[in-house]
Amino acid sequence: MSIKSDKWIRRMAEEHKMIEPFVPDQVRAAEDGRRIVSYGTSSYGYDIRCADEFKIFTNINSTIVDPKNFDEGSFVDFKGDVCIIPPNSFALARTVEYFRIPRTVLTVCLGKSTYARCGIIVNVTPFEPEWEGYVTLEFSNTTPLPAKIYANEGVAQVLFFESDEVCDVSYADRGGKYQGQRGVTLPKT
């Protein structure tokens, strides 16, 4: 299994629509020249962006967080260019990009250091072979202060690993529960 380069990422995005919309280079500034958190293709990965749809966790219902029986009322929906995450809380969002992962590929996604250095942790599980959809992102604010997340800017880097052999059963083959997800998707069992 080997990590894939920018050349491979560009080819797969352009020829097989692995990432849509796709940015072939690294973008570090907005069209007006303002500095942003970078996104797009990097040497051995792809920096994904956060869309402007958020679900911010709240404790207004004083419920227990249970992944098998998650209370959708624990979130407040928000749409905007900047999401403010309360202290010691978290928010969910989705990527701008839609992914179609090849059968021989597994990805690992890591948060960008710009956010990590501010106490904001981005968590995403691997994209499995033949999974497709928008990625649900989880942002944890580990600080005692409110924290900002910027929509349409970079939030995490996806690394692509290609196996030497094809898996027997892909995510699509087993009917994975998050296959084809479109918006911010809450836990399923």
Swiss-Prot record:
Keywords: Hydrolase, Nucleotide metabolism, Nucleotide-binding. Homotrimer. It is an enzyme of class 3 (hydrolase). DCTP binds at K112, S113, T114, Y115, A116, R117, T136, L137, E138, Q157, Y171, Q181. Signal peptide: none annotated. This is dCTP deaminase. One of its GO terms (molecular function) is dCTP deaminase activity. It catalyses: dCTP + H2O + H(+) = dUTP + NH4(+). Catalyzes the deamination of dCTP to dUTP. The lineage of its organism: Bacteria, Pseudomonadati, Pseudomonadota, Betaproteobacteria, Burkholderiales. GO terms for biological process: dUMP biosynthetic process; dUTP biosynthetic process; nucleobase-containing small molecule interconversion. The keyword Hydrolase applies. Pathway: Pyrimidine metabolism; dUMP biosynthesis; dUMP from dCTP (dUTP route): step 1/2. Its EC number is 3.5.4.13. The active site is at E138. Belongs to the dCTP deaminase family. It holds the Pfam family DCD.
